[in-house]
Swiss-Prot record:
One of its GO terms (molecular function) is ATP binding. The lineage of its organism: Bacteria, Pseudomonadati, Pseudomonadota, Alphaproteobacteria, Hyphomicrobiales. The complex is composed of two ATP-binding proteins (UgpC), two transmembrane proteins (UgpA and UgpE) and a solute-binding protein (UgpB). Its EC number is 7.6.2.10. Gene3D superfamilies: 2.40.50.100, Nucleic acid-binding proteins, P-loop containing nucleotide triphosphate hydrolases. Residues 4-235 form the ABC transporter domain. GO terms for biological process: carbohydrate transport; glycerophosphodiester transmembrane transport. Belongs to the ABC transporter superfamily. sn-glycerol-3-phosphate importer (TC 3.A.1.1.3) family. It holds the Pfam family ABC_tran. It catalyses: sn-glycerol 3-phosphate(out) + ATP + H2O = sn-glycerol 3-phosphate(in) + ADP + phosphate + H(+). It is found in: Cell inner membrane. This is sn-glycerol-3-phosphate import ATP-binding protein UgpC.
């Protein structure tokens, strides 16, 4: 296990654009930290910097209080799982698992013990004599993880390891990875663009945008109290609803007080009360545009004046296009932001 510290990390390429700009981050010993953000935000570059596959332009990287900026990747005691499984196709599962250990001249008895332990842990014992092409996608991903686990590294790095799997298998593997990390207690960093993966796996979550950190916190802290418009919009499915303060006051009046800096309001799709409760908050008289059934209820696209909202209804609606849907958003369920700064007010 290990503690990781990144101090004022900058990564700049020849075009003078900072891929990562003045980033500071601490990962606690044994913590599972998930970095989430859109494509191009710098999350995979950050992982590669920690692994030693990319050099920083400036800043300091520490593992257990030891500066490792100039350490070679092989000397950092870090193991990485990639999106493509990176297995040797001509080797058996056993051969893939033992390859790195043999290169490090690990005693044969120790190799056999480690492989037996990992094969049992990952439930790949029946596949040890098979080659990768004889395995399913999920089985190959388990082998890829097994290959890094047998090394017993200080740090695990996961670079979108589940993106090649179908939705059902991805959900299952999320649970398996979380259980595995809890068992091993190895400091882990996991990169994904999938917010559901991030919220499922993370002890702590980092939301990145354009090379900087927008917010750090537990998944529920970030969901319940987004610090910026970007975080509010990026985290949550269906996405949050935004409303211009002037539009609200134009149609409904000044129903509650908020700071002068507030010009954007937002509410989560599930944070509504069906019906009219004017004593609890603004009432929206809307028309249904589209209903998306989800089994336990439905997501409804509604129109209020010229604004579209998505609301999460916990019942099966039989209404159709153009029919009325009235709901209330309580005062405490509004998030408030400043458009110019993008920050929460």
């Amino acid at each position: 296990m290990a503690t990781i510290q990144l101090l004022n990390i900058k990564k700049q390429y020849d075009n003078d654009i900072f891929v990562i700009n003045d980033l500071n981050l601490t990962v606690a010993d044994g913590e599972f930290l998930v970095i989430v953000g859109p494509s191009g935000c710098g999350k995979s570059t950050l992982l590669r910097i920690i692994a030693g596959l990319e050099k920083v332009t400036s800043g300091e990287l520490y593992i257990d209080n030891e500066l490792i900026n100039n350490r070679e990747p092989a000397d950092r005691d870090i193991a990485m799982v990639f999106q493509n499984y990176a297995l040797y196709p001509h080797m058996t599962v056993r051969g893939n698992l033992e390859y790195g250990l043999k290169n490090r001249k690990t005693p044969k008895e120790d190799i056999n013990k480690r492989i037996a332990h990992v094969a049992k842990l990952l439930e790949i014992e029946p596949f040890l004599d098979r080659k990768p092409q004889q395995l399913s996608g999920g089985q190959r991903q388990r082998v890829a993880m097994g290959r890094v686990i047998v090394r017993k590294p200080r740090v695990f790095l996961f670079d979108e390891p589940l993106s090649n799997l179908d939705a059902k298998l991805r959900a299952h593997m999320c649970i398996e990875i979380k259980k595995l990390q809890r068992s091993l207690k190895t400091t882990s960093l996991y990169v994904t663009h999938d917010q559901l993966e991030a919220m499922t796996l993370a002890d702590k979550m980092v939301v990145m945008n354009k090379g900087t950190i927008e917010q750090i916190g537990t998944p529920m802290e970030i969901y319940d109290c987004p610090k910026t418009i970007f975080v509010a919009d990026f985290i949550g499915s269906p996405p949050i609803n935004f409303l211009d303060r002037q539009a609200l006051e134009k149609h409904l009046g000044n129903l509650f007080s908020c700071s002068k800096d507030t010009d954007i309001l937002a509410f989560r799709p599930e944070a509504i009360l069906l019906g009219e409760y004017p004593d609890k908050g603004p009432v929206f008289h809307t028309q249904i545009e589209f209903i998306r059934p989800i089994g336990t209820g439905c997501h409804v696209l509604t129109r209020w004046n010229d604004i579209l909202f998505t609301v999460d209804i916990k019942e099966r609606l039989t209404s159709d296009y153009g029919q009325k849907l009235n709901f209330t958003v309580t005062h405490q369920n509004f998030h408030t932001f400043n458009k110019k700064t993008g920050n929460r007010t």
